[in-house]
Structures are given as structure tokens and as C-alpha cells.
Design a protein with these regions (language model features):
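Alpha-helix-loop-beta-strand connector modules within alpha/beta enzyme cores
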Residues: 54-71, 130-141, 223-226
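Divalent metal-binding pocket/active-site signature
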Residues: 15-24, 95-184
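Active-site-adjacent C-terminal substructures of enzyme catalytic domains
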Residues: 95-96, 137, 158, 164, ...
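Anion (oxyanion) recognition and catalysis
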Residues: 35, 61, 89, 139, ...
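Short, acidic/polar
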Residues: 22-31, 78-88, 183
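Divalent-metal coordination cores built from histidine and acidic residues
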Residues: 52-117
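An N-terminally biased module of ancient metal coordination in phosphate/nucleic-acid-related enzymes
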Residues: 1-65
């Protein structure tokens, strides 16, 4: 059977230990398996800590695999923090994920208050100064902007502003995930901004659940409508 992982670059793999849940892999155990499978590179992600240093420390032990990290701008990492973005860039980080588990949109869907929004307080369309500063830092450091778990309206606003700022690499995270649910018409509108869409295997509906809702059918339909 052909090795399906040979030459693969996976840009979304979670590592632990995480503060709120158990992860299957650390950077070392993950890299060991992936290098043995013949993959080319990994981008390691965590919700509550930056992963650039973890990638940097593990890299010498896996010469046949390229390891990268970044930062998710949740409360635990300082939120919408342009200084953190620049620091992680200096540590070799490649990806900045806008708020994920601590996004206001995410918490609202769980019936919880608070959270981080890219809009000004009380607005549903005006971008906050903190978010603008983060986008400017991403443009300055040439990192990849990932849209995280923001609402669809926030993601659209962020993509437009990122494009205007000259951010070269914009990744729309898992549009099929039930907490985001970006329809194909919205995705089509974003194509003119040169975005990439992340088509994930699936996603859990409950934080404590190990049963994933598979996205194959939705991903295939969106790819057929929009292209790869």
C-alpha cells in the first residue's frame, strides 16, 4: 500500500500537555511518528501556549522533518497582543491564530460570557485597535494569519483588512467546523483576497468528547464548488 503520509505537510496538529485537556502527543512523540512515516513538515498548535520554542527545541532531534510553531491569541497568551506576535516571530514562529477557544463567538455558543472579539466593544463591524495592531504585526513579520474560531462576520472583516495591509498568507481555519459554519457563498467571496481554506478531517462537538464529526462530505462539496 502506498504511504499516504510521504511528503505531507500538516499545518494543524495539536500537541500537549495542554492546560485544559489531555493530548495524545507531545512535540517529541508526534515528530517521531511523523518522521518515520516520511512526512515533510509539521506546524504544531496549542490553544494556551506558544509552540515556536517547542518546535525549535525538538528540531535537532528530527533532521528529516521540518518543525514549526506559532501562537494562538487566547487569554492565556495575552489575547490580541501585537508584542507577543513579534516575539514569537523572532523565535521562528510561522503562524498566528486569532482567538480560538477563548473567542467571544466560541464562548457565546457555549452559553458563556466574555471572550475576545476582533470588533470594538458593542460593535458588529468596526475592528478594534488591538486587532488592527496584531494584523500590522503579522504583516511586518510576514507570518501566516489564521482566522481561528472567530465568527464568520469577524473573519470576513479580518480577511479584508489583512489583504489591505499586504499580509501575504491568509488561512481560513476549518470553515466546516460546526462552531464556525462558513457557507460556500461566503467562502467564494473571500477567494478574491487570495485566502487558503483549511479542510480538516473533522471536529469534536464537545470539549471532552473523543468522537469526531467528520467533514468529508462538506469538504468535498466546497472543493467542488470553489476548487482546491
Amino acid at each position: 500500500m502506498k504511504n499516504l503520509l510521504a511528503g505531507v505537510i500538516d499545518i494543524h496538529v495539536h500537541i500537549g500537555p495542554e492546560a485544559f485537556k489531555q493530548r495524545k502527543y507531545t512535540e517529541y512523540t508526534l515528530a517521531e511518528e511523523v518522521q518515520a512515516a516520511g512526512a515533510k513538515a509539521l506546524v504544531m498548535k496549542a490553544h494556551v501556549f506558544e509552540t515556536a520554542t517547542r518546535a525549535q527545541l525538538a528540531q535537532p532531534h528530527f533532521p528529516q522533518l521540518k518543525l514549526f510553531g506559532g501562537i494562538a491569541l487566547n487569554q492565556e497568551t495575552g489575547g490580541l497582543n501585537a508584542s507577543a506576535v513579534k516575539a514569537v516571530a523572532n523565535l521562528g514562529g510561522k503562524v498566528v491564530w486569532l482567538p480560538t477557544l477563548f473567542a467571544r463567538h466560541e464562548l457565546a455558543q457555549k452559553g458563556l460570557p466574555g471572550g475576545i472579539s476582533c470588533f470594538e466593544e458593542g460593535s458588529t463591524e468596526k475592528m478594534s485597535k488591538a486587532c488592527e495592531d496584531v494584523l500590522e504585526a503579522i504583516a511586518e513579520t510576514n507570518m501566516i494569519l489564521a482566522t481561528g474560531h472567530l465568527s464568520v462576520s469577524e473573519q470576513v472583516a479580518v480577511v479584508k483588512e489583512a489583504y489591505n495591509l499586504g499580509i501575504k498568507h491568509i488561512l481560513v481555519n476549518h470553515p466546516a467546523l460546526f462552531r464556525i459554519g462558513m457557507d460556500v457563498k461566503t467562502q467564494e467571496k473571500l477567494l478574491k483576497y487570495g485566502v487558503f481554506f483549511e479542510r480538516n478531517y473533522g471536529g469534536s462537538r464537545l470539549p471532552e468528547s473523543s468522537v469526531f464529526e467528520k467533514h468529508f462530505a462538506k469538504n468535498l462539496a466546497d472543493i467542488r464548488a470553489l476548487g482546491v
